[in-house]
């Protein structure tokens, strides 16, 4: 695609995964990629980009696939943004989006972010984490969603679905330069394996969890929201309530 630029090494990087179909947000996603759906006046992905820019991130690689042309305006609006195309988004899970931007990991410390988030606190990435981490929200009770198990020192020892009274994944993470380079190597290795097509990128992290130094960076519910359905969107932005009546 013409609007996708080449890559240059930068000091601090970010990868935003924006290639997916967003089928649970239909009918809106039939014509608009989920990250570009406006929530209270701002496209979701722009709340993520704004927070990264506020934190001084120099290069933000937005990995696109579905309706990719609609993201081109971001390169004009944000000098730090570079679009990277994921040509495998229909055939493979989101491991393919990280692999499409694996060169970013090889260049240094990197934030990895989902694109379909609403970040209300533009300072969520400040101060910059001092070590590799997943941002997580503490919860009570049991959930079947993605969670983290921690050891007594606070190090993450498992990433997976299902857990009780721990931290839930919110779609943001940070890898120090050494860990980012390790993750790049793990991604290359995973891509050689049969069945990698079904993997989430977090599965690769979990498979090598002992080789990475990952902790939790706690966040509060009012700082960030992940909207997975039209009902959740309508609860967050009442301008979409009409969709619940159709």
Curated annotation (Swiss-Prot):
Coiled coil: none annotated. Mg(2+) 2 binds at residues 145, 226, 228. GO terms for molecular function: metal ion binding; nucleotidyltransferase activity. Its cofactor is Mg(2+). Pathway: Phosphorus metabolism; phosphonate biosynthesis. Cytidylyltransferase involved in the biosynthesis of cell-surface phosphonates. Catalyzes the activation of 2-aminoethylphosphonate (AEP) to CMP-2-aminoethylphosphonate (CMP-AEP). Can also use phosphocholine, with much lower efficiency. Exhibits strong activity towards CTP, limited activity towards ATP and no activity with GTP. Belongs to the LicC/PntC cytidylyltransferase family. This is 2-aminoethylphosphonate cytidylyltransferase.
């Amino acid at each position: 695609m013409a609007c996708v630029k080449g890559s240059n090494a930068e000091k601090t990087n970010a990868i935003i995964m924006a290639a997916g179909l967003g089928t649970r947000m239909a009918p809106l996603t039939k014509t608009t990629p989920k990250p570009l759906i406006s929530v209270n006046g701002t496209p979701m992905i722009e709340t993520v980009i704004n927070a990264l820019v506020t934190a001084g991130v120099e290069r933000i690689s937005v990995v696109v696939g579905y309706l990719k042309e609609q993201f081109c305006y971001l390169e004009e609006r944000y000098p730090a943004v570079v679009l990277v195309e994921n040509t495998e988004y229909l055939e493979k899970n989101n491991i393919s989006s990280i692999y499409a931007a694996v060169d970013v990991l090889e260049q240094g410390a990197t934030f990895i972010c989902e694109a379909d988030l609403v970040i209300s606190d533009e300072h969520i990435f400040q101060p910059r984490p001092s070590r590799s981490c997943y941002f997580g929200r503490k919860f009570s009770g049991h959930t079947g969603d993605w969670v983290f198990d921690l050891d007594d020192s606070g190090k993450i020892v498992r990433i997976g679905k299902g857990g009780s009274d721990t931290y839930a994944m919110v779609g943001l993470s940070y890898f120090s330069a050494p860990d980012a380079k390790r993750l790049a190597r793990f991604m290359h290795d995973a891509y050689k394996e049969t069945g990698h097509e079904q993997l989430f990128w977090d599965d690769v992290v979990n498979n090598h969890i002992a080789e990475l130094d990952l902790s939790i960076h706690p966040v509060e519910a009012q700082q960030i929201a992940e909207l997975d359905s039209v009902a959740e969107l309508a609860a967050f932005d009442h301008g979409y309530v009409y969709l619940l009546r159709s």
